[in-house]
Amino acid sequence: MGSEMCIRDSPGLNHVSFEMLNIDDVFMGHEILQQKKEEFDYELEWGVGRHYQGSQIFDYWRSPFKQTHEHQTDGDMLDNSVPCGHINMIENTGGMPGDAPGPSQWGPPINLETFGDKRGV
């Protein structure tokens, strides 16, 4: 998981990210977009889930213009008592031994056929 998440064939904007106050705001936004998706042509891209890197709670949507935007919030507090972890996005490994590979700790799987495609460019 690395270059597969980039826009294919040409440079461009992958997505815009908005930091929310807390997990409640991420889920509230998810519910609102879910309710309005037919009326305003929103499309769920990926989420709700938790990223390995940074541990943010995330939710990705396509706007009516097909650009991808992310709502995310900090998922934890790290200090020197938390051991360092290693994640290799190129080899698609990370997390705890025995975990299924992928770019998130939990949540639905990412659709690599559509994530980062040219619809919103």
Model regions: which residues?
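Short, small-residue-biased leader/transition segments that mark boundaries at the very start
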Residues: 1-7
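Long C-terminal interaction/binding lobes of large macromolecular proteins
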Residues: 10
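Vicinal oxygen chelate
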Residues: 18-69, 73-80, 85-121
